[in-house]
UniProtKB/Swiss-Prot annotation:
GO biological process, one term: tRNA wobble guanine modification
Annotated keywords: Cytoplasm, Queuosine biosynthesis, S-adenosyl-L-methionine, Transferase
Protein name: S-adenosylmethionine:tRNA ribosyltransferase-isomerase
Enzyme class label: transferase
Family: Belongs to the QueA family.
Gene3D superfamilies: QueA-like
Keyword Transferase: yes
Single annotated GO MF: S-adenosylmethionine:tRNA ribosyltransferase-isomerase activity
InterPro entries recorded: QueA (IPR003699), QueA_dom1 (IPR042118), QueA_dom2 (IPR042119), QueA_sf (IPR036100)
Amino acid sequence: MKVSDFYFELPEELIAQYPLEKRDSSRLMVLDKKTGEIEHRKFHDILEYLNEGDTLVLNNTRVLPARLIGEKEETGGKIEFLLLKRIEGDKWECLAKPGRKAKVGTVFTFGEGKLKAIVREIGEEGNRIIEFKYDGIFEQVLDELGQMPLPPYIHEKLEDKERYQTVYSKEKGSAAAPTAGLHFTEDLLKEIKDKGVNIAYLTLHVGLGTFRPVKVDDVNNHVMHSEYYHLDKENAELINKTKEAGKRVIAVGTTSSRTLETIGDENGRVREQSGWTDIFIYPGYKFKIVDNLITNFHLPESTLIMLVSALAGQDNIMNAYNTAVKEKYRFFSFGDSMFIK
C-alpha cells in the first residue's frame, strides 16, 4: 500500500485559520462506513446519531503553552524552544530553532530571567534535552511565559488560548490539541448525558509527531512516534459494560481511538493501563474496541487519514474527502467534523 494512495487535492483556502465563534456550529459530515452514503449536517446534530447506552470516549489532555521564545544568556541571540515531552523532573525533550545556537552547556533565559534553560544533550534526531531552572511552580511559570504551539499550517494569531483547548481538558501534557473534541460545548455534553449516553475519559498526550509528514513511499515502512496514555479503572469498566451490553463505543478523535486500540484485547475488553503507544492504524487493521468515530478532516497522506480509512474503508474516505473539498468544508485543527457511523 502506497502513501500516495491517500493523496487528495486540497486548496489552501479550505485550511481553517481560526475557530468558529460557536464551537458546535461547525459543519458535520456523516459517513456511513457500510454504504459510503454521506449526509451534510451541523455538529450539534451529532445528538441524533447517539443512542442511549452508547459510550462516547473523550481525551481529556490539556495543551501546554509549549512554545518558549527567549535569548542566549551570553549574547542575547534569539532562540525558540518547542517542548515535546517531559523526560524526568525539570528535564524536557524539545525542538530548538535555530538549532546551531543550542549547543550542549549553553544557557538561555526567558521572561527577563524568570526561567532559564541549560542544554544538557543533543538527541539522535537533533532534538535537545534541556533542564529548566526557576523559582516556584513550573506549570505556573510556563503558563505565564509560554505560547500555544499552533500547527504549522495555521498562520493567524489565536486571540483566545482556550479555543485551542477542549472544554473538558484537564491533564496537562500535550503539544497539540485533540481537535475532534474542540466542537463540544458544556451544554452539548449535558444534552448527550441527558439522552442516556455515557461519557468516558482517557488521556493521551498528543506529540508533535502528529504533524510530521510520512517520509516513506510504502505505508508498511512508516514508524510512528510514541505518546503517553492513561486509562483509569472506572472508565475502563464503563467501556467494558458498554461492549458487553452490545452498545457502541464512539471514540472522539484519532487519539482516543489509538489509546483504546492499544489497550484493547482480542476479546474486546480494556483495562486500567498507562504507558507509551506507537500504534499505527491503517487499512487492513481490525478494530477491537472502537465502533464509530468523530474526527476532523486530516492532511493528505497523513497517518490520520490512514486511520480513518481503516475504520470506514479507503474508497469511502477518499470519496468523502473529495466531496468535502467540493462542498468547501473547512479542514484540519479548526475545521469541520466527520462522524463515521
